[in-house]
Amino acid sequence: MIGAMLRKVTGLPVVTTVHSDYRLDYMGRPLSHLTFGTINALALRRLDYRIGVSDAMVDLLISRGFPADRFYTIYNGIDFTPPPTQGDRLEYLRSLGADVDENSVVVGIAARMNPVKDMATLVRGFAAGHAKCPRLRLLIAGDGPEKDKLTALAAELGVERQVCFAGWISGGMDRFYSALDINALTSLSETFPYALTEGARFHLATVSTAVGGIPYLIDQDVNGYLFQPGDWQALGNDLAALGNDDELRRRLGEKLYEKASTQFSIQKTVSTQLQIYASILRRHRRRSSARDGVVICGAYGRGNAGDDAILEAILQEMRSIDPDMPITVLSKDPRSTRLTYRVRAVHRSNFLAWHTAMWNSRLYINGGGSLIQDVTSRRSLWFYLANIRAAKRAGNRVQMYGCGIGPVTRESHRSLAAKIINKYVDVITLREPDSLEELRAMGVTEPEVLLTADPALILQKAPDDETDSVLLRAGIPPHGNYLCFALRRWKGFEEKAPLFGAAAEYAYRTYGLTPVFVAVEKHLDPGAGQLAARGLTIPHYFLDDAGGAGTIIGALSRMQAVVSMRLHALIFAAG
């Protein structure tokens, strides 16, 4: 609140770090929520910049209407210097009241017992896990208003001897974490809790709710387990699996330590904080002018990984030129575009919004992909041509970026496209020679034309752990011998679909390649894969949502061969 009041007086940029969801800060205290909570919520919207302590916190605020390009992300880092030896484990655990022996597998949590931490789910999940793995013990460090209820719940479930309520731990937390085998968290809401990185420092296998920034640390089945809030059955299964498998605990704990110590150290946090302050100062000093930045228009926000990869590549190029450049994207799903790319985004049909953006920008990019064509829709051709004309008339330089041209079948459309492009476009970059020939055949002679490559080729694959997690979530072993089918519904596909199934059978029986049906456009392509796989008598998998371009590239890099009806599946495979 004070920062919001001083903002205009000082003329300085004001930034705040958001550690928690302001709507939950005063849970259970209605008067404080009504007063302090309301003041905080209003003040937060009046600041220049905000730093979220996880990407999930930033996403939450963007989804509530905060400007997407005014956020930074920083993660809580800790010192990963190896801790000293903490002494006898059993002696320490027994001093806290835990009923343990040499064979016990100890699950631990350090948290306040309040509704947000949802420890009832922890106790229920532990009881379910203990039924399958009697070695399990639960150690709870902390206190709070729900302690009596949790104690009664443990007794009701018959695990009162196996659950130890240790209260607040004195003498630091290193000894507590060093005595655990499994670190657990059951919160309904978090940003990025220190409890998990503290556990990672001690190489602990970890089970947590998939809330806040936690999925950015834990890759499912790769370096830990995630479950949905309140799902005590899933928690119980995870605890039992870890309790019964010493090697699994060791492996997951080591993988989590590797990631946390590299990406979530205190050194990384300090470096990121300094970079954020430098960026804010640059943006504050940036000369304000009537026109600044770029408007980007394409087939974005439709769930097509190829089109979204083009946008990602364009944004990467723009930010390499000017990291502080204002960017507005015309999208069919502006909310998703804002959340994914942290840019301003307006709906394609919101004429007033994108027209206003054009009058404030310096550059308009029509890109990329095959936008100038009338096979899938003539209305889309009219839309893109109208936007090109509007952008130029608004005073922008106009570039068609990474394009494929055609087919434009109607003569009237060819004439209209040539007229608009000749009059209003400054530069065109094309991704293949056929498009150059098509432009010449249409009579386009005025813009500068350059033959380059598809923008998506500059994108890199995601880290292996992220790719492994995407595959494992789909039930696909990360390292097999695979043949990818990236299919789509097209005219006559229903009749031809069995041929893809026959090819999959042949490849499996002849070369030992297991078919994986990958959806490039996740809203449309899964049905094509299901149709082709109908009647298969061999093992096969479906990857209906491989995430962003990086993880799709990573997934396709695990394939021995790719059969594709989608151009960008081939481009991703080549990358």
Question: Where do the protein language model's features map onto the residues?
Answer:
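Active-site donor-binding acidic/aromatic loop of nucleotide-activated sugar
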Residues: 146-149, 160-169, 176, 225-226, ...
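Aromatic "clamp/platform" in nucleotide-sugar-dependent glycosyltransferases that forms part
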Residues: 188
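A short, active-site helix/loop in glycosyltransferases that binds the activated sugar's phosphate group
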Residues: 45-72, 78-82, 428-446
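Nucleotide-sugar donor phosphate/pyrophosphate-binding loop at the beta->alpha transition
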Residues: 13-15, 23-46, 59, 405-420
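A conserved mid-protein helix/loop that constitutes part of the nucleotide-sugar donor-binding site
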Residues: 105, 109-128, 138, 145-151, ...
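Active-site anion-handling motifs in enzyme catalytic cores
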Residues: 283-575
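Short alpha-helical donor nucleotide-sugar binding micro-motif in glycosyltransferases
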Residues: 168-169, 175-180, 553-557
